[in-house]
């Protein structure tokens, strides 16, 4: 038996009614196959009733593992429900060879900082992918993803940060209630999962080498104060690119050096978090190393559309003769109708590129996905976990 995915969504006025409608649709799509894992996404005002949604999904799907999260917006099918109440359910039957393990990440304050526990200890090569839901109010995400890169090297980690936290509650859900974990993960093995990260940013200007810096601070680019080099680079751009820069200055850092050419997928893109005019240093949202290649980037709707379409086409090619069983999506709350001028942009693109397929996910306050084989936290991205049958 192969992998089967079912999904459902409902905008019913109560969590129980919405969960019933969504879970019934997912159950029908499974076609009698057992549910190994069910994910529940609860949105809008219904985030105050997560236990009701979980109880109903448990009754209808009887999953071996039940996890979920609250969210400010939901993705289901060809639609992005950026606002309003709703429940989305995603269910997977892993077939004869697949297995799934749900794990919890917990943090503890220690004298030198924070200790992280809960990353699975498994043999190298045993894990196909990890889906990660991260409560960043309690989880240092960058440090956590570095730990994943160390303990599960090469394993794609895909997920998101809840964009709506219930009043006086926690956003992560497991079993029949809220979880106290800082992160919830699902580790899959024995099945094939393709990750996709569309940062939607276009490189502009010349490549620049970091010649002095440490931590997240770049002091020099190409042997000169970083702020001076960036100012000169912006001045040399054409008028259209300078206009895009006004919406936010972005810097891409090459993840895997030593290639003859670097394209959009080779950079981790970050905004500039600060600058010191006296020293000429700039601060970026990622660690830097001397010798690393950097390049200015711009983000605009056309670039984001083209990049997502290109990434989807690559995944379609990578599937070969295999069938896509379903997908989980995590897209930024800075995309959607505000960025593209119309609703459902990413969901429609995913269905056009890989579908029709069962698709569920959430509009996130941060996305998680691999670049250059390492997991990173992102903003303004569309990230996807594509499950093959």
PLM region spans:
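Small-residue-enriched flexible segments
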Residues: 1-51, 56-59, 63-65, 69-340, ...
